[in-house]
Regions:
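Sec-dependent N-terminal signal peptides
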Residues: 3-12
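Short, low-complexity N-terminal intrinsically disordered segments enriched in polar/charged residues
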Residues: 14-56
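A solvent-exposed, acidic/Ser-Thr-rich amphipathic alpha-helical stretch
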Residues: 51-104, 124
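Short, surface-exposed coil-to-beta transition loops
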Residues: 93-96, 111-113, 126-132
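A short, structured loop/turn motif at beta-sheet edges
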Residues: 101-108, 136-142
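Beta-strand elements of well-folded, non-transmembrane domains
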Residues: 102, 116-120
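A short hydrophobic beta-strand element
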Residues: 106-116
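Short beta-strand edge/turn micro-motifs at domain boundaries
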Residues: 129-155
């Protein structure tokens, strides 16, 4: 009988929830950090056309998968250099609508709609929309984006 009770206790203990970091719910602070990673990366890197900001938002091995193309930090830098050479390029403003933000251990997964407006001299010259997902990971430098997936939504 003692063995049955011991076995029952052991099996019950194995079923208890684990309170490790992996099972911790997303905090309001982490949600704000995740949203700032997305908004800040688009405002400063893509809208601000500043490749120096990549280190503040991306991991070293960051990639974007967009419409069959793989973008890494080096490819983004080349793109930004090209943007600097464009005369009279429009300003880009992005707005996000979040579908979900969930934490898994030391990572945060996000899904959102990304709306961009392109303005030149107070005139709207274009609009784009994407359906995107992103993965942020906790690093020694703080939270950084590790991967994104982007699908263009037809206008």
């Amino acid at each position: 009988m003692r063995y049955i009770i011991l076995l029952f206790v052991l099996l019950t203990a194995c079923q208890l929830p684990n309170n490790s970091e992996q099972d911790q719910a997303l905090t309001a602070e982490e949600e704000a950090i995740a949203k700032e990673l997305i908004q800040g990366s688009f405002d400063k890197i893509w809208g601000g056309v500043d490749s120096n900001e990549i280190v503040n938002y991306h991991t070293d091995d960051f990639i974007i998968l967009e419409h069959g193309v793989v973008w890494d930090n080096d490819r983004i830098k080349v793109y930004i250099r090209g943007q600097h050479q464009r005369e009279n390029r429009p300003l880009r403003k992005n707005r996000m609508e979040y579908i979900s933000i969930e934490k898994y251990g030391a990572s945060i997964q996000m899904a959102y709609h990304n709306y961009a407006e392109f303005v030149r001299a107070d005139t709207l010259v274009g609009k784009r929309q994407w359906l995107e997902s992103a993965l942020a990971v906790k690093t020694e430098k703080g939270w950084r984006l590790k991967m994104m997936h982007s699908t263009r939504v037809p206008n």
